[in-house]
Amino acid sequence: FIIKVPLVKKKSLRKNLKEHGLLKDFLKKHSPNPASKYFPQEAAVMATQPLENYMDMEYF
């Protein structure tokens, strides 16, 4: 059987942060570290695999 999940379109995180003038600060504080993906033992912090393009998501 098929279950339909209703989706709602809203502004993306990137658009909201940009409208409030907070995008640059957010990107500085949450910059991705590609080295942690391929060399987790060499990364300074715990290795994580971030979602790519999560800031552009518009459907929830």
Swiss-Prot record:
Keyword Secreted (UniProt): yes
A molecular-function term among this protein's GO annotations: aspartic-type endopeptidase activity
Keywords linked to the UniProt accession: Aspartyl protease, Digestion, Hydrolase, Protease, Secreted, Zymogen
GO terms (BP aspect): digestion; proteolysis
Propeptide residue interval(s): 1-45
Top enzyme class: hydrolase
EC number: 3.4.23.1
Pfam family, one: A1_Propeptide
InterPro entries cross-referenced by the UniProt entry: Aspartic_peptidase_N
GO cellular component: extracellular region
Signal sequence, start to end: none
Reaction(s) the record says it catalyses: Preferential cleavage: hydrophobic, preferably aromatic, residues in P1 and P1' positions. Cleaves 1-Phe-|-Val-2, 4-Gln-|-His-5, 13-Glu-|-Ala-14, 14-Ala-|-Leu-15, 15-Leu-|-Tyr-16, 16-Tyr-|-Leu-17, 23-Gly-|-Phe-24, 24-Phe-|-Phe-25 and 25-Phe-|-Tyr-26 bonds in the B chain of insulin
Disulfide bond positions: none
Compartments (UniProt record): Secreted
General function of this protein: Shows particularly broad specificity; although bonds involving phenylalanine and leucine are preferred, many others are also cleaved to some extent.
Similarity section: Belongs to the peptidase A1 family.
UniProt name for this protein: Pepsin A
Lineage: Eukaryota, Metazoa, Chordata, Craniata, Vertebrata
This protein's encoding gene: PGA
